[in-house]
Amino acid sequence: MDGVLWRVRTAALMAALLALAAWALVWASPSVEAQSNPYQRGPNPTRSALTADGPFSVATYTVSRLSVSGFGGGVIYYPTGTSLTFGGIAMSPGYTADASSLAWLGRRLASHGFVVLVINTNSRFDYPDSRASQLSAALNYLRTSSPSAVRARLDANRLAVAGHSMGGGGTLRIAEQNPSLKAAVPLTPWHTDKTFNTSVPVLIVGAEADTVAPVSQHAIPFYQNLPSTTPKVYVELDNASHFAPNSNNAAISVYTISWMKLWVDNDTRYRQFLCNVNDPALSDFRTNNRHCQ
């Protein structure tokens, strides 16, 4: 009788343990999925969350032009209060502008999990190809000479670029020159060259009412002439001017963060904001859908 009772109790205990293990596996599966991508940062994204500052606190460091070579200094925005590492982004302002013109976007990107250096150029009148060289120098500074607190947060193997106007033209040029970059985001870009042979994934932001770099002469030809094998997206801001990137802009925030997250962090959670887009804030949207596959 005691043997029968022991076997019954043992069977009941085993069944309970198996049920508990199954429950634990189901409960843990989202975490397991998240851990499969070592670069995934932050909670599951929503569109509204991408229009505001993200989950990370942000520290800043001012880079004196006297302490660097190859570019004119600038401001670094980087996540703090964490031991994680993050991809790096160098950003160039436009013609006659300085780093303050993109301060909002630099901080926004950092708050969502990037180390961002918004540069000042050697001269406010530098043309796009000079800005490309300065973006390259800025990335090298981030990797090798930035403060230890910054380098402790930087994953130097995951780098990207962005820029406004002539800085956007410089962004296209450096993307052509440096195929190791993970992503490029030219904002209302300007360049006399319309063809850039790059394999770096490119998101181009145009502005419908741009009279400085009209989209028909700049942003759209840039997009059209990128190789068909290159992941590419063109978004056109409805009724926006050339200077839309210089102030807080919800659409720029959503698409820039999403593009950087997808390609710098390999975070496919952000595809939802870049595929099958129907956005009233845009007057045009184009893509070859290579990022949606």
Swiss-Prot record:
One GO molecular-function entry: acetylesterase activity
Origin: domain of life: Bacteria
Signal peptide (from-to): 1-34
EC number(s) from the headed UniProt entry: 3.1.1.74, 3.1.1.101
Pfam families for this protein: PETase
Active site, renumbered: 165 (nucleophile), 210 (charge relay system), 242 (charge relay system)
SUPFAM superfamilies xref list: alpha/beta-Hydrolases
Reactions the enzyme catalyzes: cutin + H2O = cutin monomers; (ethylene terephthalate)(n) + H2O = (ethylene terephthalate)(n-1) + 4-[(2-hydroxyethoxy)carbonyl]benzoate + H(+); 4-[(2-hydroxyethoxy)carbonyl]benzoate + H2O = terephthalate + ethylene glycol + H(+); an acetyl ester + H2O = an aliphatic alcohol + acetate + H(+)
Thermal characteristics: Optimum temperature is 50 degrees Celsius with pNP-butanoate as substrate. Optimum temperature using PET as substrate is superior to 70 degrees Celsius. Shows 70% of the maximal activity at 30 and 70 degrees Celsius with pNP-butyrate as substrate. Has half-lives of 5 hours at 50 degrees Celsius, 80 minutes at 60 degrees Celsius, 40 minutes at 70 degrees Celsius and 7 minutes at 80 degrees Celsius. Is thermostable, with a determined melting temperature (Tm) of 84.7 degrees Celsius.
Disulfide bonds: 275-292
Family: Belongs to the AB hydrolase superfamily.
Note: The gene encoding this enzyme comes from a leaf-branch compost metagenome. The source organism remains to be identified. However, it is presumably a thermophilic bacterium.
UniProt function note: Catalyzes the hydrolysis of cutin, a polyester that forms the structure of plant cuticle. Shows esterase activity towards p-nitrophenol-linked aliphatic esters (pNP-aliphatic esters), with a preference for short-chain substrates (C4 substrate at most). Cannot hydrolyze olive oil. Is also able to degrade poly(ethylene terephthalate), the most abundant polyester plastic in the world. Can also depolymerize poly(epsilon-caprolactone) (PCL), a synthetic aliphatic biodegradable polyester.
Alphabetized PANTHER family for the sequence: DIENELACTONE HYDROLASE DOMAIN-CONTAINING PROTEIN-RELATED, POLYKETIDE TRANSFERASE AF380
Official protein name in the record: Leaf-branch compost cutinase
Species name: Unknown prokaryotic organism
